[in-house]
Amino acid sequence: MKNIVFMGTPSYASKILEEIYKAKFNILAIYTQPDKPVGRSQTLTPPDVKKLAIDLGLNDIVYQPKSLKDSGVKEHIKSLNPDIIIVAAYGQILPRDILDIAPCVNLHASILPAYRGASPIQSAILDKNSLSGITAMAMNEGLDSGDILAFSILDITGMNSYELFDKLSIMAANLTIKVLNEYKNISPIKQFDALSSKCKKIKKDDGLVDFSVDSASQIWAKFLAYYGWPGIFTKNGIKILDMEISDLNGEVGKILGLSDDGFILGVNGGSILIKKIQAA
């Protein structure tokens, strides 16, 4: 299990690619999403995986098709004759004809079958789970429904999404190397579909908080889950950059007290201490 095609896009995937490189597996090709315009100036920016590939001197084997169904993609991967295809937050669905070329292993950021889909990290935090982890899965045509090859579990209590992304990417990188080294001896386990759950792609509007509807614990969960992007904000566009739960009770939307750290605001069934805000 030495010859690898890698598919991934964000920093989560780049850490996995880096460990594969350090472990001296033969990386035949790196597939990642096309460069995208970023910021107000719309500067064309490469994804994290491409940035790492350039740093490692692997830019000659980077491929960025708009779609894996594009002409020549299947033929190119097939011509490489990979032993395995490693997939981590690539951002495109692998079509059947690519899944058939070689075993495809996905590193999904949840303990499957929970949180199949696009936002497992944020969803676990939103649901106030104490545990999450990484599942190495043999890919099929379903949504994160393939057989389980290995998994690792982590206590996520109190973590925001940025912290959890970082820890899970390291965990995923280590699990990838383990799976690559032990692949031939692994006995896959079918997922128990009856216990499965799905999670949606995060949208900017998901960060909206309503003090008359959301409880203090719900606002805190949103703050942790949407840390960085989209963040949490009120209907008039004020963004809450730092906060914690308070133990005071009072009228919703009213300032209940002041402290050296900020001000305490009444919300549905409780209050929050707002430490830092940003105007619209």
What is the predicted role of each segment?
Residues 244-260:
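A conserved acidic, glycine/proline-rich C-terminal tail/linker
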Residues 136, 231-236:
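Short conserved beta-strand and strand-loop elements enriched in small hydrophobics
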Residues 1-228, 257-280:
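One-carbon transfer enzymes
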